[in-house]
UniProtKB/Swiss-Prot annotation:
Residues 1-20 form the signal peptide. Belongs to the EMP24/GP25L family. The gene is eca. It comes from Drosophila grimshawi. Residues 21-183 are lumenal. GO terms for cellular component: endoplasmic reticulum membrane. Residues 30-126 form the GOLD domain. It comes from the Eukaryota. It holds the Pfam family EMP24_GP25L. It is a single-pass type I membrane protein. This is Transmembrane emp24 domain-containing protein eca. Residues 204-216 are cytoplasmic. Its main location: endoplasmic reticulum. One of its GO terms (biological process) is dorsal/ventral pattern formation.
Amino acid sequence: MRNQLICLALMLCALHSASGLYFHISETERKCFIEEVPDETTVIVNYKVELYDPRSNGFMPSSPGIGMHVEVRDSDDKVILSRVYSSQGRISFTSHTPGEHVICMYSNSTAWFNGAQLRVHLDIQVGEHAIDYANVAQKEKLTELQLRIRQLLDQVQQITKEQNYQRYREERFRHTSESTNSRVLWWSLAQTVVLVCMGFWQMRHLKSFFEAKKLV
């Protein structure tokens, strides 16, 4: 029982998936991130772009002329979102296929700012953690207890999605393993057939050689 509770707690912690970071890019550079996302799961991307100021040797809020082009591809390499946003924004999308989703960002470079260095603050939230429960409570007029129950139900639903996704990955891995084993088997059989044929041909050739030399 204790082990089950520990596993459940670890899964709940994993569901609160959020990654906050910042990185530096030039205006012509493209940066991509990969997120493992179950199907029918909400993903929220918050970002803010800052422009390097050589006079102050620091970063300042970017000008209105600099925005970010955001492109999202699903596990089938299908573009599900491609759009130019402002220098600061919040992007939301829902996955419809499980697997790796690639989120790419690059600036809409202009001749005036071309080559400038940018700092991009990025926060990616996946699953139950992407839901703004304060807004949900206000909109649906939920009490604290009702809100807590809602959170628990969402967590259980997300756990189910995660379990389905893990089963999906196991099935794909098993299919890949079976396919690889089958190819190895057929390749081994092909090698065996080739070796047998070569041995038979060499024996016939040697026999013909000996007969021609009247050694047999």
